[in-house]
């Protein structure tokens, strides 16, 4: 639906995504891919100046945001030197028309994504030693990463993967978002990265895999320890 009716984008362009982890993040990314263009993913908590820096550095043609991020995005766009050439899409303000959905259901659809050495995504470094740098990743780069993970036998199509790492990092982008597309794994979202919400998601959704970093597993440890300490 996003690709057919929301995104007006030529090939070899950029679409910037500034929003929290949610299904619409994935719809936005793949709708950009379906135009044979590249997705730029940045932290949903980016402030207006950080967003403006990315705009001036990459010159995207469309920005996807949410109600949660729209204020900062609008403030950045207002200062952007090419603000007249960019389209803003707030995914929370999209109205899904049933008639159009019915048309899509009857379509033969295959994602027309970038291939080979074509640029598929741009991710920005943290900028701890200076201004963030945009790192362009080709489709081959991402595909190699996915296949390397899958060949380890950690995941298969039966898995329910908990999405707790922000999608603007390469690990969750490949091991959660893109792995889901290629191998039909399922994604479970949490609204807040806190031990209670994570434990609730694990229980309710029969999560079988978690892509994490030490800080995430420290949350698990702290949550379990608090529950144990509360009993004594």
Model-derived features: where do they sit?
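Conserved AMP-binding/adenylate-forming
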Residues: 2-46
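Conserved ATP-dependent adenylate/AMP-binding module captured primarily in the ANL superfamily
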Residues: 5, 44-75, 145-162, 194-208
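Conserved coil-to-alpha-helix start sites within the AMP-binding
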Residues: 19-30, 45-48, 165-182, 193
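Short hydrophobic alpha-helices that are characteristic scaffold elements of the AMP-binding
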Residues: 30-37, 57, 178-182, 221
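ANL superfamily adenylate-forming
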Residues: 68-116, 224-232
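Conserved pre-ATP/AMP-binding loop-to-beta segment of ANL
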Residues: 105-124, 131, 154-160
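Conserved AMP-binding A3 loop
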Residues: 120-146
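Conserved AMP-binding/adenylation subdomain of ANL enzymes
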Residues: 143-160, 167-232
């Amino acid at each position: 639906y996003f690709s057919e009716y929301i995104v007006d984008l030529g090939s070899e362009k950029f679409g910037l995504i500034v929003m929290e982890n949610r299904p619409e993040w994935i719809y936005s990314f793949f709708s950009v891919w379906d135009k044979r263009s590249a997705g730029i993913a940045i932290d949903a908590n980016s402030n207006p100046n950080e967003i403006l820096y990315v705009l001036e550095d990459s010159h995207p043609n469309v920005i996807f945001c949410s109600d949660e991020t729209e204020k900062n995005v609008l403030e950045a766009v207002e200062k952007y030197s090419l603000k007249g050439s960019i389209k803003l899409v707030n995914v929370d303000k999209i109205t899904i028309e049933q008639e159009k959905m019915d048309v899509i259901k009857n379509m033969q659809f295959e994602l027309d994504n970038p291939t080979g050495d074509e640029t598929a995504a741009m991710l920005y470094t943290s900028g701890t030693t200076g201004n963030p740098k945009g790192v362009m990743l080709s489709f081959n780069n991402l595909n190699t990463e996915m296949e390397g993970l899958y060949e380890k036998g950690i995941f298969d199509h039966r898995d329910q993967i908990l999405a707790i790492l922000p999608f603007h990092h390469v690990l969750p982008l490949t091991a959660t978002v893109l792995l889901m597309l290629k191998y039909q794994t399922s994604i479970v979202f949490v609204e807040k990265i806190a031990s209670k919400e994570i434990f609730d998601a694990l229980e309710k959704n029969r999560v079988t895999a978690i892509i994490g970093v030490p800080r995430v597993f420290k949350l698990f440890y702290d949550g379990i320890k608090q529950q144990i300490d509360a009993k004594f």
